[in-house]
Amino acid sequence: MDKKKLIEELVEELNKYAYEYYVLGNSSVTDKDYDKKYYELVDLEKETGYKLPYSPTQRVGDVILPEFKKYTHKARLWSLDKAQTLEEIREWHNRNVKFLEEYNRTSDEELPPLKYILTKKFDGLTINLSYDENGVLVTGATRGTGAIGEDVTAQVKTIKSIPLKIDCHDFLEIHGEAIMTTEAFEKYNSEADTPLKNLRNGAAGALRNLNVAETAKRNLSAFFYDVGYKEGAPFKTYMEMLNFIKTKGFPMDDYIRECTTLDEIQKEIDYIRDIRFDLNYDIDGLVIAIDDIRTRELLGYTVKFPKWAIAYKFEAQEATTKLLDVEWNVGRSGRVSPTAILEPVELAGVTVKRATLNNMDDIARKGVRLGAEVFVRRSNDVIPEIMGVVPESLEGTKEIEEPKVCPACGAHLVHEGVHIYCENTLGCKPQMVKTIVHFAGREAMNIAGFSEKTAEQLFEKLDIRDISDLYKLEYEKLLDLDKFGPKKAQNLLDAIEKSKDCTLEAFLYSLGIPNVGVKTAKDLVKRFESLENLEKATFEELVSVQDVGDIVARSIIEFFKEERTLKVINELLSLGVNPHYEKKEVLESPFMGKTVVVTGTLENYSRTSIKEKLESLGAKVSGSVSKKTDFVIAGEAAGSKYDKAKSLGVTILSEEEFENMI
């Protein structure tokens, strides 16, 4: 075969594979086969000097550009007017209704009833791609002023989900948002000398980096949502436009909703607000746009905004505030960790006063100092984290000092990797109290009525220094505790006695092995079936267990090497604790060996009971949807997991369909 022809075929084939992998999330070729064809193409291009502009080899280069050139957009990239309340959306909607009624009353050709299309408002950097009459990507540009942007074509080509060639013979400009996913952000920060402050800065900084190789390291993604300019037949509706974007192979978010009433819009706002922190990327609101293009054209624009669309903005999930102090706290493992004390700031609808700082390495890497203005980010409803400092605020600030002794008990501290630990395991109150509380917890020994307040009193007044001491408690001594009468004392003793008969997985979890949670404990018990077998397990045997990696395996081995650990376990057993394992008979079913995700509310099952049912059928129950997911069981109010399953082509079952299958 002619070598040029072979190059053209390889380019077409590799671009098809890239679309399947990066846009559809479902590759039809192995990484090994892809790499083989890719390097075959590299060699052929080198040999012949023949390179197509849309070849995948043209995505990343070592070029460092001298400057950014200007690019004049064919069609303006408008900003959107913003609303933060439903009342503001109502006012906008009423203006649209009034316009429609007046127009239809005076015009021979009526406009259709109002229909709105809702899409997510991505928090990244707006980009405009232009494709020539051959469908080849010729320019990628930033929004800039809306009329003129910066040419970032080389940077845009590093985004692997962006097609370098499309099946379209009209000159085209398409608008989208370059974003950085949480996964890409965390991976980059784990390896970077200077960590990124947030996802948006990560995307914007990458596209505006003259060193294209640096842009590529950030592994950006993109979503497209608008055709700004197109020669040829115009679109009649926004939905028609979105369908065009999808059929041309551009990556799109799968959340697109049609609404005709304010109640429907409110419902969608509430839904997206609920799931926004579960997403793998940042959004800061919803875009609400009129579907009919002719209605849009007649409504027109203000000086700044189109009248036919509005952005509903959520509360900020990132803010700047002042770092007042750093508090050092001791965890169950003895790790001493810093917590930032902040000047109160409103963030994502709550007042934030504290934030995570992780460790001294994290503090140094981010350049955090007392008295500085810091960037604070809140996501997934967890304690906010400090992402970095405002450089201009560093004058007059103080260095954060690492503690020399334990802040709780005054004992000597030791370094292990990037963390510091208090070695006073038995005498350090926070360690012991948290250890006892963990041991007594519902997922562990399930000692009913046990609280942190009780644990504190047992430590302070009854000299409890080990979990085995719980089984030596005496009725008379419990009566000396605050708010402990005869009934409460007896109830606690009864609950402790009852806890002796426990499952092996609960007992294993109760021991507090570092990095071993409830699920891992269950997986370990399934594999080894007894405490004795687990204690003797080799590294190779441990990592063969599903989801047990090197770190977890080493944690388990080190835990059972400790003389004190074995002493505590033996004492618990001698005091009558009886961890038992009953091998469950796994029924033959279509779910045998399959990965299943459950989302939404089921009528006949709680989360625990559906999990137990699936496991009895031989399924692995996962908390997140991926290409490896086999089934998603969707109940009422199914959320983002349902949407992701749909986009990946994962089989979705209703509760009724699930029950019919079993």
Swiss-Prot record:
InterPro entries: BRCT_dom (IPR001357), BRCT_dom_sf (IPR036420), DisA/LigA_HHH (IPR041663), DNA_ligase (IPR001679), DNA_ligase_CS (IPR033136), DNAligase_adenylation (IPR013839), DNAligase_N (IPR013840), Hlx-hairpin-Hlx_DNA-bd_motif (IPR003583). One of its GO terms (cellular component) is cytosol. NAD(+) binds at residues 31-35, 79-80, 143, 177, 313. Keywords: DNA damage, DNA repair, DNA replication, Ligase, Magnesium, Manganese, Metal-binding, NAD, Zinc. Zn(2+) binds at residues 406, 409, 422, 428. Residues 586-662 form the BRCT domain. Disulfide bonds: none annotated. It comes from the Bacteria. GO terms for molecular function: DNA binding; DNA ligase (NAD+) activity; metal ion binding. Its cofactor is Mg(2+); Mn(2+). GO terms for biological process: DNA repair; DNA replication. This is DNA ligase. It comes from Clostridium perfringens (strain ATCC 13124 / DSM 756 / JCM 1290 / NCIMB 6125 / NCTC 8237 / Type A). The gene is ligA.
